[in-house]
């Protein structure tokens, strides 16, 4: 019976990974939002850059939140100083 339980759990893991792939389909929009966040974060403090990253992620879609949060954490650590000079 443990073999059947392990097989059913493997099936559940596969379905979870499929749902994650759907949320990652907005990768191009996440790159665009991260670029705009980097441009807006220049000259602001690290905390302000993090808040802007979170708000931008919520507004553009759920798939973007992960990238925006990661960028926000980077802004807190670096103070957003390396994001100056947007192209």
From Swiss-Prot:
User: What lineage is on file?
Assistant: Eukaryota, Amoebozoa, Evosea, Eumycetozoa, Dictyostelia
Q: What species is given as this protein's source?
A: Dictyostelium discoideum (Social amoeba)
Protein family per UniProt: Belongs to the hssA/B family.
Q: Which InterPro entries match?
A: HssA/B-related
What gene does this protein come from?
hssl18
Which branch of life, at top level?
Answer: Eukaryota
Descriptive protein name: HssA/B-like protein 18
């Amino acid at each position: 019976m443990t073999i059947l339980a392990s097989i059913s759990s493997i099936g559940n893991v596969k379905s979870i990974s499929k749902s994650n792939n759907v949320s990652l389909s907005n990768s191009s929009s996440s790159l665009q939002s991260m670029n705009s966040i980097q441009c807006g974060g220049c000259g602001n403090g690290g905390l302000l850059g993090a808040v802007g990253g979170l708000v931008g992620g919520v507004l553009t879609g759920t798939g973007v939140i992960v990238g925006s949060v990661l960028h926000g954490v980077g802004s807190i650590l670096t103070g957003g100083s390396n994001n100056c000079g947007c192209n």
